[in-house]
Each structure stands twice: as C-alpha cells, then as structure tokens.
C-alpha cells in the first residue's frame, strides 16, 4: 500500500506506545514484484498480496523507527504463516536473497529468546534466567558457525526451546534473514544483553 498505517497490535503497555506513529511510505509496485517472485514452499502456490487492509504492525515500526526516525524509507512488510515448518520459513528467506542485490534491506524483527510469561521486572530485571542464557548461547553459536540446519531445527532443544519460546513467532524471523544470507559471508552479533530476564536483545547482521 502507498501509505501503510501504524498498527498497535499489543496490550498492557504504557499509553505512550499506543501514541506512536511511523508514517513511512509503502512500496506497492515493489510489493507486487516481490509477491510475484515468491512461491509457498511445498505447494508452490503464489504468495498473497495485501494492498489495502493491514499496514505495519509493531514488529516492523518498533524496530524501524529508531533506525530510520525520519520515516523516509519505503517499507514492505511480509507476514508469516506460523503453522508452517521452520524449514519453510527459511526457504522463503532464500527466495528473498536476490533483493539484497537491488539495495533492499531485509529485516527479521523478533527475539532469539522471548517469554513474556516469565518476564521479571523490578530488582535486577536484566539478570537473565539460566535457560534463557543457554538458548541464546546455542542459537548464537549456530549463527556464528553457519549451522543453518541447527538453526532451523531449534525444536530439537526440547524443553529449552519451549521455555525460550512458548510460541514461535518471535524466533521465526531469524530464519528469513539467515535464509537470505549468502553462505560464508561475514556475520556479527551486537547488543547481546537481556531485558526483563527472559527477552534476548541480541541483534545479528549478515554482510
């Protein structure tokens, strides 16, 4: 859409967050081209295109606004199908890789550890749980070492994965960015701290 609206798809947070707006331009022509170039893994069905109804939810604007506060960059948001296997999300990321050659920044907005149910506020809120530190460490090592199979097979970590992600929507974005990366290209992590004891703020850059 030409001017995606700012969506506040959350609850229980300070009112100042609900007042936030991020009036970036959309890129409807680019969105059409991207949609036409993608197929759903397995079925090979086309990927749908929404030019009217949704907009930018907090997974997009809450990250992009600090990065580009002038709101002068065109943005296309890609929705995720949570019912699909992790390998399917990675495969879509691989299809997006060619966009990087045209100056497109691919942002996977999530958290390597995200468990709000276990969030701890007050005294020492950033002193993370042992399980949160361990999951973040394992996934961080997989990213650094290029273990893309392990990155996709995160559920093999069993209860550790369940504690880190009671639901998976905050983990899946890293599979898109990892899929879009060129094998062997440089990768680095930064901001490797925690918030509220159960949310990893680790950020990763490929290239």
What kind of region is each of these model predictions?
Residues 12-13, 49, 60, 94, ...:
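Intrinsically disordered, low-complexity regions
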Residues 33-36, 40, 73-74, 82-84, ...:
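Surface-exposed, charge/polar-rich loops and edge strands
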Residues 1-49:
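A short aromatic-anchored loop/beta-hairpin motif
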Residues 32-88:
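Internal, conserved structured core segments that host functional sites
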Residues 45-48, 103-107:
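Short, structured loop/turn "capping" segments at alpha-beta junctions
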Residues 17-25, 79-86, 161:
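Flexible, glycine/proline-enriched loop segments at strand-loop-helix junctions
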Residues 9-16, 68-77, 152:
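Short, basic/glycine-rich phosphate-binding loops at helix/coil junctions
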Residues 2, 8-11, 25, 57, ...:
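Generic, ordered loop/turn and secondary-structure boundary motif
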């Amino acid at each position: 859409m030409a001017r995606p609206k700012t969506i506040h798809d959350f609850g229980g947070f300070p009112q100042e967050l609900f007042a936030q707006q991020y009036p970036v331009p959309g890129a409807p022509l680019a969105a059409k081209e991207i949609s036409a170039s993608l197929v759903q893994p397995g079925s090979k069905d086309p990927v749908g295109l929404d030019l009217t109804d949704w907009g930018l939810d907090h997974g997009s604007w809450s990250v992009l606004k600090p990065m580009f506060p002038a709101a002068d960059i065109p943005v296309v948001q890609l929705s995720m199908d949570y019912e699909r296997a992790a390998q399917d999300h990675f495969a879509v990321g691989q299809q997006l890789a060619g966009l990087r050659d045209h100056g497109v920044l691919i942002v996977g907005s999530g958290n390597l550890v995200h468990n709000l149910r276990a969030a701890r506020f007050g005294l020492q809120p950033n002193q993370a749980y042992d399980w949160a530190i361990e999951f973040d460490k394992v996934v961080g090592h997989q990213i650094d070492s290029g273990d893309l199979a392990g990155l996709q097979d995160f559920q093999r970590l069993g209860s550790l994965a369940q504690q880190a992600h009671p639901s998976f929507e905050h983990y899946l974005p890293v599979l898109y960015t990892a899929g879009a990366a060129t094998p062997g290209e440089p990768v680095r992590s930064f901001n490797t701290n925690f918030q509220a004891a159960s949310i990893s703020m680790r950020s990763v850059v490929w290239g």
